[in-house]
Amino acid sequence: MKSNKATFFLGLLLVYAFCIMLIESRCYTNDDCKDGQPCPVPLACLFGSCICPWKSQSKLPICQIICANLD
């Protein structure tokens, strides 16, 4: 029984690590966040002093990036 719990939690940890890597790689390929750093917000990057959601597109005439100032 304990073996099953350990295997389950190990699998969960591996899935979590894979998701973090996937999110960070999306940050680097996103035009809005080319020079950004990975951050813990899902599908987001640091962009200047703001957090940019991955789906935002700064190339639009009116910038639609939703920014949150970092404290």
Curated annotation (Swiss-Prot):
Q: Where in the cell is it found?
A: Secreted
Any one of the GO BP annotations? defense response to fungus
- Record-annotated disulphide pairs: 27-45, 33-50, 39-52
- What keywords tag this UniProt record? Antimicrobial, Disulfide bond, Fungicide, Plant defense, Secreted, Signal
Extract one GO cellular component term from the record. Answer: extracellular region
According to the record, the signal peptide region is 1-25
Assigned protein family: Belongs to the DEFL family.
- Name of this chain's protein: Putative defensin-like protein 303
